[in-house]
A protein has these predicted regions:
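Extreme N-terminal starter segment of soluble prokaryotic enzymes
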Residues: 2-4
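Acetyl-CoA-dependent GNAT
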Residues: 7-79, 84-86, 94-99, 103, ...
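Flexible nucleotide-binding loop
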Residues: 90
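Short acidic/polar active-site loop segments enriched in Thr and Asp
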Residues: 110
């Protein structure tokens, strides 16, 4: 399985929302706060200095993860990780996590 990790593009906003809402509905529930953040990733994550990555397979976004800044400019929280249900267990989440670790090291983040 050839999975590629790519950075956020505005046209991926709906995929970010759908992947995360599916995960939340499966394991928890979607709170109003989640709804707001997930529906506006550019405003609530990217514009605040965060990063969003996607796992793509056959030109489809099949997983996502975000790095959100904390009060420190060099410390980020890994959040909003989700993978399509039918592709879980195939190490896609692990690839997203590894990408975040390498990205953070390359940018001297904690």
């Amino acid at each position: 399985m050839q999975v590629k990790i790519v950075s956020f593009k505005e046209e991926f906003s709906k995929d970010f929302y759908n992947l995360n809402v599916e995960w939340l509905k499966s394991y928890f529930y979607v709170e109003p706060f989640d709804e707001e953040i997930l529906s506006k990733p550019q405003e609530f994550i990217i514009d605040k200095g965060g990063f969003i990555f996607f796992a793509t397979y056959n030109s489809e976004n099949v997983g996502t993860v975000a790095l959100m800044p904390t009060n420190s400019k060099t410390t980020f929280e890994l959040t909003k990780m989700a993978v399509l249900p039918n592709l879980r267990g195939l190490n896609i989440g692990q690839k997203l996590l590894q990408h975040c670790i390498e990205f953070s090291k390359n940018h001297s983040f904690k």
